[in-house]
From Swiss-Prot:
Its EC number is 5.2.1.8. It is found in: Cytoplasm. The gene is tig. It comes from the Bacteria. This is Trigger factor. It comes from Verminephrobacter eiseniae (strain EF01-2).
Amino acid sequence: MAVTVETLDKLERKMTLSLPVTLIQSEVDMRLRRMARTVKMDGFRPGKVPMAVVARRYGDAVQYEVLTNKVGEAFTVAANEANLRVAGRPRITETQGTAEGHVTFDAIFEVFPEVRIADLANVEIEKLSTEVTEASIDKTLQGLRKQRRSFAQRAHDAPAQDGDGVTVDFEGKIDGEPFANGKAENFRFVIGEGPMPKEFEDAVRGMKSGESKTFPLAFPTQYHGQEVAGKTADFLVTVKKIESAHLPEVGEALARSLGSADGSIEGLRADIRKTLEREIRSHLRARNRRAVMNALLANADLELPKASVQDEIARLKANAYADLKQRGVKDPERLEIPEDKVRPTAERNVRLRLIFSEMVRAHGLRAKPEQVRAYVEELAASYEKPAEMVRGYYGDRRRMLEIESSVSEDNVTEFVFARAKVVARTISVDELLNPKDPKD
């Protein structure tokens, strides 16, 4: 087999493969003889069809299959021998004017780039930490009590205040005209907890049962309802009922309702601590990994294979269509998703994948079996039957590949932190679990 490799662009290569015709033909003949032993044709007994007839019927298809396989095998062998790390599938075409006795093909493909990362010792990265305090346990316990609160109707002349459940009728108009979803009857919400806009809550706060009020409400320009985004509506609201909240007492009944085995508040607080510590580990892992990702993106130099980017664009679009379909949109593929809308995300994903892959390869950071086991056991610990969950994880190959990848990313994160300029910052549990910036 004769092979030549030519550089076409930074990452694009052309490999010319020349295979002996005899190699192809011998494989074709062998397959046709094998087919002749079992093929069925009208006018012939099974296994008695002449080779010439079998060749006329199936020869072209068999030759195409053999050529495809042989060229693919030859390409893989040649790429490995040349130490080429191929990105994506090659585009293979047969060339004209080939040498006598040989068939020649050109394979156009891309290779993975060299990844150059700046000296990590000069890279500054923030690393977050936190710890569970008695105050964070108190706040969580208060939240659990609120989930189990009851409401009782307040006196007719009592004004609505934060924490009250209010039932209202409302109607909004823009320039005197009603708009979609701008009207409701017997709508109930809790003041201070959404989902109503702050201006709406401010208007209702202080009103009494039976009172009505008209007030303006300016919708933000980024409001999800495009019909009203950036416009000001006049709302008429009537309060029909006000209810005050009553939290359950902190005692044995509450503890047992929340799953405390012994019914003690001490046991409940211990359970809350354990849950918070598990959530903290997960959130810190994600936040610190993201900080490392951003630092590597800013300090790595590499070319992106076009094929990899196009594959990622296709994957993102397929995921978007699947999400729309799950939300009840019929035939979501008819909705055009412009490529330029997903390209930045696709390029970022490919860049990160290449950087992490190179870090794992260059520094031996592939997930070890014991690390994977510890990660799986941590995931399973929150379930009622952890051992069954562990077996379930190990029985799901796709899920295990995701876990192995996640553990490898954790290894990269720790590797980078060990070598970079780390700026340590301690934050509260609430800041970690309920960040103001949704990107966190």
